[in-house]
Amino acid sequence: MPRKIRQLIAELEKVGFVNRGGKGSHRNFLHPQCPYVVRISGNPGADALPYQEKDVKQALKEVSQ
């Protein structure tokens, strides 16, 4: 069962990512140690898509290095 969008957002915010806004249901998360923007789209209660989970996993790995 896929995780929810709100869970991905919580994981990003827990390690220091900051939501820098976006349009509609899109959110842009930035972190000083991550060289790219992590974009999450969808309503918080929606299921996360596989590419979104992959992007978050990669960003968390990048920050932990």
Language model segments and positions:
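Basic nucleic-acid-binding interfaces
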Residues: 2-21, 30-65
